[in-house]
Amino acid sequence: MPKYYIWASDPHGTGQPWIDLVKEAQEKYPDSETIFGGDYIDGNKFSLETVKFVYDQVKFHQASALAGNHEQLMYEFVEHNNDLWYINGAKSTIKSFFGRGYSKRVAQEKLRSNPYYIFLINLPIVIETPKFIFVHAGITPETNTNHQRRLNDKTYATYFNLWARNEYFYSNIKNKIFAHNLTGKTIISGHTPTGLISGRYDNGQAGFDVTYTGEQNEFACPIRKIQYPNEPARYLTDNGCHGIRSHYGNVCVFNSRSAKLIEVFNND
């Protein structure tokens, strides 16, 4: 077991600035395993550079990587002609991968034989260690044991792992009451920019508010921790790279034994 886990998720084509944060964390914490949390594509201009880095880290540096919902959108477009990807960043990703835009049919053909596409669609959905569950969006206690599922799986568990937002954060969505973590393990996720998340606890414990008011183009997306007494924490980490160009990600370092957050690398 490594002494530390480095978690880096949701770069959305940020490229070198995000890569530099990951390398900075790796240099400071050499006794670590890096786990990438998905959503490497769409949004910014450098999807190919971002995916190449993740690919090389997995193939040659003992890192692990998860798929995110944007990788699933790409998969559904290529394999099932689902155009939803095209309103979520497909054009910038296709241009990054191939140097120019293509018709949908040609893009499908080119992606289907692309080694980085093949790499992405075969990534796992959940990674579990003795102390942690790493997942792109969220987990429920009854769906945290099957690590064989991939993007072609159509179960609710896979949907939840890739897409869940409020149904993961809250037990009472209307009143934004945080759910308990009943898994017995610390859960690390990305997917939702943390500045959009707020809530409170069911025991009177103070919660936290959103940093986005609906008016500003940029807003803070710090690490958020949800934790009830005598339960493991849930860490929310998405730095908002998909929509906030000045953000380069939250790269987090966790102690593998205590499951505590040690340090965050970002450009905030």
Task: State each model region's role.
Residues T129-P130, V253-K260:
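Short acidic-glycine loop/turn motifs at beta-strand connectors
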Residues A25-P30, F60, T129, L182:
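Glycine-rich phosphate-binding loop signature in dinucleotide/nucleotide-binding domains
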Residues G43-P130:
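Active-site neighborhood of divalent metal-dependent phosphoester bond hydrolases
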Residues K95, R100-Y235, C241-R245:
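Acidic, His/Gly-enriched loop-helix segments that form or flank divalent-metal centers
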Residues F265-D268:
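Short, solvent-exposed aromatic-acidic interface loops
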Residues A8-S9, T34-G38, S64-N69, V135, ...:
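Active-site neighborhood of phospho(di)ester-bond hydrolases with catalytic His/Asp-centered motifs
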Residues H12-T14, D42, Q72, I139, ...:
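Short, glycine/acidic-enriched loop or turn micro-motifs at the edges of active sites
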Residues M1-F53:
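N-terminal active-site segment of His-dependent metallophosphoesterases
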